[in-house]
Amino acid sequence: MSKNKDQRTAKTLEKTWDTLNHLLFISSGLYKLNLKSIAQITLSILAMIISTSLIITAIIFIASANHKVTLTTAIIQDATSQIKNTTPTYLTQDPQLGISFSNLSEITSQTTTILASTTPGVKSNLQPTTVKTKNTTTTQTQPSKPTTKQRQNKPPNKPNNDFHFEVFNFVPCSICSNNPTCWAICKRIPNKKPGKKTTTKPTKKPTFKTTKKDLKPQTTKPKEVPTTKPTEEPTINTTKTNITTTLLTNNTTGNPKLTSQMETFHSTSSEGNLSPSQVSTTSEHPSQPSSPPNTTRQ
């Protein structure tokens, strides 16, 4: 019945807390509006009332929580008193009478120790906790969380009944005295322990720098062949020697110019070109008939 009452009171307190919070929110919103002075005064009074009621509900919550704490302490005190009143007995062996009973109160003091049962495989660390009561103090040792270590599965031991030759890896040569078969089978035990293997780091090979040649073909311009223009052949002036020209003309007195012109013509006949004087003389006298000269070669 007491539990039901506590639940009801808790529910009613929660409801009142929620309603008061809503009222406070509404009143603060209305107060922000520009109302008349009387309305603002009433809203402020309501806000004060709601805040005081909220404080009261908070106090009730705290009181109910303290009541629950006092109930738990009372239960602990009752349990300790029951333990004190009941004095358990244990058996002791007497050589004359056989078995006799004796009380724990004669041996143990006011502090009662409660030991937790521990399994043989798991170790538990005991942590003492003290509980204060009105008259006596009881120390209870509670086991902490056990630390379970995983056991390594050992391989099963093989029976040593069968003595087989494969069990022995080698026969030491110190046993063999004169047996040739033993010397053939035996192995010598090395005196020195095998040393550490020396690890040689590979040395870096020297890198040769190679300059890449230009693979492009060198374009050489062909040499210009000098073109020689044909030069004009030199004109050779050939003068005929031992040639006597005798001009036998009938009319020597008639045209003295004509004879002189013909002489010049024969002297320049070996050359290919005509002189301007010849051209001019021929053009001046086209109509005059020229008598063929009679040339005699000696």
From Swiss-Prot:
Composition-biased stretches (Polar residues): 260-298
Ranges annotated as biased composition (Basic and acidic residues): 211-232
Annotated positions for site Cleavage: 65-66
Region Disordered, residue ranges: 119-161, 190-298
Transmembrane annotation, as ranges: 38-66
GO biological process terms, semicolon-separated: symbiont entry into host cell; virion attachment to host cell
UniProt name for this protein: Major surface glycoprotein G
Upper classification of the organism: Viruses, Riboviria, Orthornavirae, Negarnaviricota, Haploviricotina
